[in-house]
Amino acid sequence: MNDSVFSKKRILLLGSGELGKELVIESKRLGLEVIAIDRYEKAPAMQVADYSKVIDMGDKNILKNSIKEFTPDFVVPEIEALSIEALKELEDEGFKIVPNARTVEITMNRDKIRELVSRDLKIKTANYDYIYKFEDLEKKADEIGFPLLLKPLMSSSGKGQSLVGSKNDLNQAWSQAQANSRGQVKGVIIEEFINFDFEFTLLTVRKNNGENIFCLPIGHLQSNGDYQCSWHPLEINQSLISEAKKMTTKILNNLNGSGLYGVEFFVKENEVIFSELSPRPHDTGMVTLVSQNINEFELHLRAFLNLPIPHINLIEPSATRVILSDQEHMNPIYEGLNEALEVENTKVLIFGKPISRKGRRMGVVLSSNSDINLARKNADEAARKIKVSSK
């Protein structure tokens, strides 16, 4: 077929959160058919997809049968909590997993990505080890030193992560990690706490021909491992960016699957330290909806669909601030939306989650300005005006 002819494709999305919702919207702009799957009804991406289905994605047989039911051209994981064995078997049968099943497996497990990056590729990370029994935790904590981080080997959005200040906090941190662990793995990763100067995300597009395209770096702040705000671009020494690009290229040359990757780094005393990697659009990258000519969701699609990706341009410096719920609500409503939208050059995205919980991310504010500090100030101001409540 002529390369200039684009036929309609069917995409099946595994996980239907807010990032998946934006991916569906961009997919529909290209005339694609989308099936959104998640473990609960009325998930954000389901609200804009052609079809949806609620299943237990951790059950290998259920997941395999559901994917075969829809016969998609591409299977696109958006979350970590799914059966990797199902994806491996489906890939062997000819289904296209984005970016590939091996990459999904490595990046969904903190032990596997650390072993690849630190042990195999010799890239700088925080000191770490794995613990599977609480009895071994105290000894290893003394070796790592306090403060330290304790995380489930598998979780998402920072869930179950604790900053541990002393031995007295280990029991609670262990319990929290176990309670928030996803999948069958119940171990934890114990990690040196790096008192970094700042952290950033390097969105990287991997094309089918192996070429990597880098977006400008995105600054961000997290709380307990969960994204709170981001700004784009981040002012940073070019030598640090060059080092981050070298690290990213080394990792992606090993993983070798097309799509968009969100690669997180720490910087401490002019040293770049690898933090985490996601083989999909990144929460900090939602800022690209207003900051770039091609946002991260469209970049992901173009990459795995093998569509052209011209030069990525910055439209205007921009910032985000998340909208959090302070308690649980069924069918939540949003107070202060009018006041928030009065803030100059500001947009509000409400994700449409059917239930709110304390600390749950329910929306995001996007703000643009030629002065990045003013963009950040406006995003913060608008987000403060919005309160999640119920009737």
Swiss-Prot record:
Residues bound to N(1)-(5-phospho-beta-D-ribosyl)glycinamide: 18-19, 78, 283, 353, 360-361
Reactions accelerated catalytically: N(1)-(5-phospho-beta-D-ribosyl)glycinamide + formate + ATP = N(2)-formyl-N(1)-(5-phospho-beta-D-ribosyl)glycinamide + ADP + phosphate + H(+)
GO cellular component: cytosol
UniProt EC number: 6.3.1.21
InterPro entries for the chain: ATP-grasp, ATP-grasp_carboxylate-amine, ATP_grasp_subdomain_1, PreATP-grasp_dom_sf, PurT, PurT/PurK_preATP-grasp, PurT_C, Rudment_hybrid_motif
Protein residues bound to ATP: 110, 151, 156-161, 191-194, 199
Pathway listed: Purine metabolism; IMP biosynthesis via de novo pathway; N(2)-formyl-N(1)-(5-phospho-D-ribosyl)glycinamide from N(1)-(5-phospho-D-ribosyl)glycinamide (formate route): step 1/1
PROSITE patterns, per database record: ATP_GRASP
Residue ranges of every copy of the ATP-grasp domain listed in the record: 115-305
Taxonomy, superkingdom: Bacteria
Molecular function GO labels: ATP binding; magnesium ion binding; phosphoribosylglycinamide formyltransferase 2 activity; phosphoribosylglycinamide formyltransferase activity
Any one of the GO BP annotations: 'de novo' IMP biosynthetic process
Binding site for Mg(2+): 264, 276
Pfam families reported for this sequence: ATP-grasp, PurT_C, RS_preATP-grasp-like
Record keywords, A-Z: ATP-binding, Ligase, Magnesium, Metal-binding, Nucleotide-binding, Purine biosynthesis
Record function comment: Involved in the de novo purine biosynthesis. Catalyzes the transfer of formate to 5-phospho-ribosyl-glycinamide (GAR), producing 5-phospho-ribosyl-N-formylglycinamide (FGAR). Formate is provided by PurU via hydrolysis of 10-formyl-tetrahydrofolate.
Complex and partners: Homodimer.
Family: Belongs to the PurK/PurT family.
HAMAP family per UniProt: PurT
Protein name as it appears in the record: Formate-dependent phosphoribosylglycinamide formyltransferase
Organism the protein comes from: Prochlorococcus marinus (strain MIT 9312)
Source taxonomy: Bacteria, Bacillati, Cyanobacteriota, Cyanophyceae, Synechococcales
